[in-house]
Amino acid sequence: MGYGTHIDDPLMGGASRYRSDVSVTVFLNGPADYEGGELCIDTGSGETRIKLAAGSAVLYPANARHSVSEVTSGERLVAVSWVQSMIRDAGKRRILSDLVQARDAIDRHRDPQTYSRVEDAYVNLMRMWAEP
């Protein structure tokens, strides 16, 4: 069994519908329990194949093309869910993610003045772009 290439539906839920911005896959059993079954995500610069330890999770943009390769033996157990972000636009979420990574790298190098400037930029972009 596998799951063909697709992007996730833009809206999830029943009566309380929400926008699916981020997809979540939680691996409930380990890679040794089955053959195949990799989560394959098209990153735009190639395909990333993911098969993680039990209890591990992967988050990825819900609009990313992805599939699950065929399970050839054993059983693949996962839980999937979706998250609505306060930042609707995936490009803006990527910018914020890059800023957080840069901020954390600056913090590791103990540069408090530059850290504060990057943190201020992050906070102000959140203020501009976030939706409750």
Model-derived segments and spans:
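Catalytic core of non-heme Fe(II) oxygenases with the double-stranded beta-helix
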Residues: 1-91, 96-97
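Charged/polar low-complexity intrinsically disordered segments, enriched in acidic residues
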Residues: 87-126
